[in-house]
Regions:
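Class I (Rossmann-like) S-adenosyl-L-methionine-dependent methyltransferase catalytic domain
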Residues: 1-14, 26-36, 40-59, 65-72, ...
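Conserved S-adenosyl-L-methionine
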Residues: 23
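A conserved beta-strand element that flanks and buttresses the S-adenosyl-L-methionine
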Residues: 81
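Short catalytic micro-motifs in class I SAM-dependent methyltransferases
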Residues: 84-88
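A short glycine-rich, Lys/Arg-flanked "PGG" loop and its adjoining helix->strand segment in the class I
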Residues: 96-108
């Protein structure tokens, strides 16, 4: 599954006006969303040296240098992207605090796109300090969100021979 293709389809189908990209790192989705004309808030706690400074001055992108756990939601969004964010935090923080904040700052019928590595993924087996999530964790949020879609896929680790990343995504819609 190509993430960019999936996110492009979500943007085309739902036409979000305001998007939040949590822990954006390489800004792929931020740039993609801005190219569709959406206003994008980018949240990350590092300066991204891989992209030129002019991206931080893009007219549709606002950059916030914050840690996810310290970010104070102020805006309402149509689409929130959390690619490979949850595995860095305990379930209590993600499922109670962060998902409540997302719910409270996601417009009605807004979409939350979450990805995480599954336990047999190279990233998880080589980083024991990461936290494991599965689909059931997000199904338990049914009082807040409707589970619209989910999928998992495997792809090779480009820097390790005979190793695989096993990743799952969920798409939640605010009721």
């Amino acid at each position: 599954m190509e993430w960019a293709k999936l996110v492009s389809e979500l943007i085309q189908n739902h036409e979000p006006q305001r998007i939040l990209d949590l822990k954006a790192r390489k800004w792929y989705f931020s740039i993609l969303a801005a190219s569709y004309g959406a206003k994008v808030d980018v949240l990350d706690d590092i300066d991204n040296a891989e992209y030129p400074d002019y991206l931080k001055d893009h007219p549709n992108i606002t950059y916030y240098k914050w840690k996810v756990e310290n970010f104070e939601f102020k805006e309402k969004y149509d689409f929130i992207i959390a690619k490979h964010v949850v595995m860095y935090y305990k379930k209590e923080f993600i499922l109670d605090k962060l998902m409540t904040d997302i719910y409270n700052h996601l417009n009605r019928n807004g979409i939350c796109f979450i990805t995480y590595h599954l336990p047999d993924s190279y990233t998880m087996t080589h980083n024991e300090w990461l936290f494991q999530y599965n689909l059931d964790d997000f199904k338990g949020l049914n009082w807040k969100f409707v589970l619209k879609d989910f999928w998992n896929y495997t792809n090779p680790v480009y820097w390790e021979i005979n190793q695989e990343q096993h990743v799952e995504y969920v798409i939640l819609v605010r009721q």
